[in-house]
Amino acid sequence: MAVPDRRVSKTRAAKRRTHYSVKLAKPIKAKDGTWKLPHHINKFTKEY
């Protein structure tokens, strides 16, 4: 089993964890003017 050569500081560990956040889906405006999520079917027009 691997053993770390040296201790990772709190600051370095925190810098690495900055990319762990959840990315929120950004709604886009469809052709008909309604807002929808990308890669989802529109409830009204049934378009992808």
UniProtKB/Swiss-Prot annotation:
SUPFAM superfamilies referenced in this protein's UniProt entry, alphabetically: Zn-binding ribosomal proteins
UniProt keyword Ribonucleoprotein, yes or no: yes
Pfam families per the UniProt record, alphabetical: Ribosomal_L32p
GO molecular function: structural constituent of ribosome
Source superkingdom: Bacteria
Span list, region Disordered: 1-20
Keywords tagged on the record: Ribonucleoprotein, Ribosomal protein
Disulfide bonds: none
BP term (GO), one: translation
Bias type Basic residues, positions: 9-20
Cellular component GO terms held in the UniProt record: large ribosomal subunit
Family that this chain belongs to: Belongs to the bacterial ribosomal protein bL32 family.
Name of the protein described by the UniProt record: Large ribosomal subunit protein bL32
Gene: rpmF
